Amino acid sequence: MKINTALSFDGGGMKGLFSAYFMKYFCRDAGIPGNQIYKYFNIIAGTSIGGIQALAYASGYSPDDMIELFLAQQNPLNNGSNNPSSIFYPPVSTLQKINTILYGDQTWYQNTNLKALLNAKFGQSKMFQLKTNVLIPSVEIYTTQVPDVGTDVKAYRPVLYSNIKFRGLEGQNYLVQDVALSTSAAPIYFPAVNIPEVTTPDSKFIDGGVFQNNPAALSWAYNNAINPSANRTCILSVGTGLGTIGLFDPVPVPPPESVRKYLNEFRNFLLLHKNYTTEKTEEIVNSILPDFENVYLLLDLISLGISGPQEAINKILELLSLYGTKINNQDLFYYRFNTIYDLNEDTELDTTNADFLNYIQTAAEQQYQQDAIKIQ
């Protein structure tokens, strides 16, 4: 029997630690050497931090290497501000985040440390040198001209990087580190990036999660297209956990007092640093109150826009597998490892404190134990 095997990783920022712990436990129990994961899967797919993990495993790195990478982002004083090598350094206050979303044109973080990390991991290796096939989503932003109008506008194009020479896939000769940086350039968090080989005018690339945060279905489709004679496809899909992306508060829609707490910070900032009168300060604060409140709604909608399609794909594959549907005479065996976090926990994409990292490890251990029979 010919079997297609696929391993897929969701995006999720620092919550990717959840995926890394799963792979550690999975390899341990399956007797797979951690640095030889690539030998067991025809395709490894991943988006954002999941893309970094996919590229790492396809390069011969182990789950322990990935766990070490995540833990290296931790700050020693548990407040996000004392680890200059962290990819989320320097820290960004709640007030700065709100102000950037509403009025700024800069991202919260620069990608200098992320670039250094990826260069240290992948060096000058190119995609075609990876040890197994990979599939890495991203999105290209470029300038185009509206026909008969002559106006330049920004256009968007979903991109699938791969080392496979196949229709719809690209990037076989790109540096692995460039692909990793591209798929993880989360809007608002990190700036869009250039890839030297791409010559489209004003072309830049952003996080693949904007296109497809869960690439499991893509891995399935391309696996079957490349190996159509297989009788069975087995997909292992690894999530990063479902929680809040509220950025400022563990509660998805914070109560008015939370919003006003940040307004008070802003009020004090105006009084102390701008030397505005009390009357002028109150005028400014009252004028932006609706904007502050709308930030939370905006971020909840962003969260839904990412997690909704992600979980829809999970449900489709789950049902196809459950009811024994045959596509091109191929059986589908599908398992997804994921969890739902306590909504009272801070599960931001850029949370790096020790409490968070310990919580993620515990969540992975508990979910692995709960799914023990399924995993076997």
What are the language-model segments listed below?
Residues 1-376:
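Conserved catalytic cores and adjacent C-terminal regulatory segments
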